[in-house]
Amino acid sequence: MAQTETQEKKGLGRKVQAFGSFLSSMIMPNIGAFIAWGFIAAIFIDNGWYPNKELSQLAGPMITYLIPLLIAFSGGRLIHDLRGGIVAATATMGVIVALPDTPMLLGAMIMGPLVGWLMKKVDQFLQPRTPQGFEMLFNNFSAGILAFIMTILGFKLLAPIMQFIMHILSVAVEFLVHLHLLPIVSIIVEPAKILFLNNAINHGVFTPLGTDQAASAGQSILFAIESNPGPGIGILLAYMIFGKGTAKATSYGAGIIHFFGGIHEIYFPYVLMRPLLFIAVILGGMTGVATYQATGFGFKSPASPGSFIVYCLNAPKGEFLHMVLGVFLAALVSFVVAALIMKFTKEPKQDLEAATAKMESTKGKKSSVSSKLTGATTGTGAAGVAANKANGEDQNEASSEDEEEDLLDNYNTEDVDAHDYSNVDHVIFACDAGMGSSAMGASMLRNKFKKAGISDVNVTNTAINQLPNNAQLVITQKTLTDRAIKQVPNAIHISVDNFLNSPRYEELLNNLKKDQDKA
């Protein structure tokens, strides 16, 4: 019974992670639009850095129309590619026009995937039944009719529901703010970050509500709750001073990556090594939120990534010191509590490598920065098992891992010399989101090709679920290769342990030159 309950809890956690990951896939590609809107609002509105009545008119339409439509398009495209995105964006206009005074981000996050899924089902039904020669007619009219129906439904049905939901959430936040209880949110948010459940909270609640508040009040504290780098740097500073061995040695580099790069996951293994440090990050987070609430601080747009540099750039006029104070006090409290815990408690039984593997298992995939903490191959097995669980497989861990290994062996994913590269002119790096680690890997390989004089091979990056059917050569981290194979089974697949440091790149480079010289 206890084992069944544990499995159910793990399954629920995976579902929340998957949900958060999907929300993140809609929001993160559009962060640039949020930042552009934030700059326009911060600089040109009446109380901005350089007020300009003419240019300030851009802010309203951008947050009312542009950003919700971009989110809806991204959500629809995730489900049914370009066609799903276009129909989803069109249908979302119904919700936007029905509630023009409320930035309809939440409505776009619902309407986008929903309409994309409906378009996919309509196409699956119609395509086998479409007479030859009528394909364009059926395709265009089916998309147009579905967009028409869903736009009307969005206007009449979804908009009132969204208005009610936004009202309830806003009242809840206002209640916490009024009673000065907003800092208690950190009790949920800070542990959720380390358990990788934060995306569902951050992108599902804070971003829509924060955007709504920023549009009406000019800024929102909700953008500063989860992204504050203070609690994390406090933990790492404690390790720099009181840590030992590998944890101490790696904490310096981790601190730079976390504080200036905004990659918070780099400090998660340090907390997992000593679970009592959850107390430190919670108290640090609460201190930061309490400071911002007391000073009335907030950002005009999402501070993403959670880097101190981004915080400096996004700080509203006249509130730079408030921003610094919130980060400093959060870091100070986190550091003091962590230092006391490390000084007066026993050394952890698990080392940093074990904690990193635990973090990757919790995340359900290989971390793009974990190699900075451990050896290149650390945690691969644990992450592979977790990835299979996240995909909904109900087999036991051993059999799941064996199946994955068999699939990789069948494709010779670790034997670069086993493939023919004579017809390869396009290499694709693929990761979960298609933005972070794969982009860095692709950039590095492009530089290697340039130095080697290989100019006729294009190197790009994308998300695994957006790999094109005609992909020729796909490079993924080992824990994600099985998903890539299932997505494009006819491509050559190469597994690496770390996108930024793999000996297989040199092997690939030599094989490409050799095979293409023969051709």
From Swiss-Prot:
Localization per record: Cell membrane
Domain PTS EIIC type-2: 19-351
Signal peptide stretch: none
Keyword Repeat: no
Biased composition (Acidic residues): 394-406
Membrane topology value: Multi-pass membrane protein
Extracellular-facing ranges: 53-56, 164-172, 301-320
Pfam family, one: PTS_EIIC
Residue intervals on the Cytoplasmic side: 1-30, 78-141, 194-280, 343-519
Ranges annotated as spanning the membrane: 31-52, 57-77, 142-163, 173-193, 281-300, 321-342
Enzymatic class: transferase
Region (Disordered): 366-406
CC annotations in GO: plasma membrane
Quaternary assembly: Homodimer.
PANTHER family, sorted: MANNITOL PERMEASE IIC COMPONENT, PTS SYSTEM MANNITOL-SPECIFIC EIICBA COMPONENT
Name of the protein described by the UniProt record: PTS system mannitol-specific EIICB component
Source organism of the structure: Staphylococcus haemolyticus (strain JCSC1435)
Gene from which the chain derives: mtlA
